């Protein structure tokens, strides 16, 4: 490489980093704080059971990492802001789509947290890991399911999403999606072949979560029907021996009770 060419490349990189600095200085980029799956509502209990370590340590990010480079940190910030052009330029300049900060937060997780679907697509195409977890056991795939981002879940499924991956409560993507009544996400996950009767650390299946933590509205009725159609066990009870049918009856969810009784739920 000639000296003028090397100087031109350095100038281009300096301009790129300068642009990032201006954006950050102007307060345009999203803060790194974000929602997680850590706070899960637990019916009838003031304090949920302590979380167990993730079952898939290969994709579990440690609580702290060695300091990441400026390009990688700027990539996370740009992904949070949804700046597609800047994300592409940072990747071209050498930023890693797989890097994570000291909290285990990757650029892809930041994109999912801020609903930046196109940025997430770019990062996945660049090799971002959809199963990489942060210190709270949130992964891009699990968070997309929990927040009802069907397009994001669809992308993750085509880029190696692990259907057996679990959150801090050992809940699968199907469980967290059912808890929130995210019908389209539930459809996608069931079609992909996710286990329908997986039991989390609270002793609940996706069906139990939809009944116990839902509000009995149409979207939860649809969720329950989808789970039953996929073969969910209507008589798989919680730790106290209470079945989904009994939970639905106690809450006055008449339509759900009928659905469950049609498959011999009791």
Which functions belong to the PLM regions below?
Residues 234-265:
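Leucine-rich solenoid repeat scaffolds
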Residues 77-82, 110-116, 143-149, 176-182, ...:
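Ankyrin repeat A-helix N-terminal signature
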Residues 56-106:
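N-terminal segments that cap or nucleate solenoid repeat domains
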Residues 3-20:
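N-terminal secretory signal peptides and thylakoid transit peptides that target proteins
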Residues 83-91, 116-124, 149-157, 182-190, ...:
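Ankyrin repeat structural motif
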């Amino acid at each position: 490489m000639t000296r003028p060419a090397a100087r031109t490349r350095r100038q281009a990189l300096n301009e790129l980093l300068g642009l990032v600095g201006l954006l950050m200085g102007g307060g345009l980029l999203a803060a790194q704080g974000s929602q997680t799956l850590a706070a899960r509502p637990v019916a009838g209990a003031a304090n949920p059971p302590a979380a167990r370590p993730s079952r898939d340590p290969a994709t579990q990010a440690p609580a702290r990492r060695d300091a990441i480079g400026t390009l990688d940190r700027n990539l996370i910030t740009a992904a949070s802001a949804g700046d597609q052009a800047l994300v592409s330029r940072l990747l071209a300049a050498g930023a890693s789509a797989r890097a994570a900060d000291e909290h285990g937060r990757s650029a892809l997780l930041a994109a999912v947290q801020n609903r930046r679907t196109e940025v997430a697509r770019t990062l996945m195409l660049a090799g971002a890991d959809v199963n990489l977890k942060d210190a709270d056991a949130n992964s891009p795939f699990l968070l997309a399911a929990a927040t009802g981002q069907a397009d994001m879940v669809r992308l993750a499924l085509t880029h190696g999403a692990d259907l057996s991956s679990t959150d801090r409560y050992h809940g699968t993507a199907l469980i967290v999606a059912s808890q929130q009544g995210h019908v389209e996400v539930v459809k996608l996950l069931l079609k992909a072949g996710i286990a329908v009767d997986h039991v989390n650390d609270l002793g609940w299946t996706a069906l139990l979560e939809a009944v116990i933590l839902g509000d009995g509205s149409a979207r939860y009725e649809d969720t329950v029907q989808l789970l039953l159609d996929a073969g969910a066990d209507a008589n798989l009870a919680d730790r106290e021996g209470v079945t989904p049918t009994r939970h639905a009856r106690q809450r006055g969810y008449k339509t759900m009770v009928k659905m469950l009784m049609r498959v011999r739920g009791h």
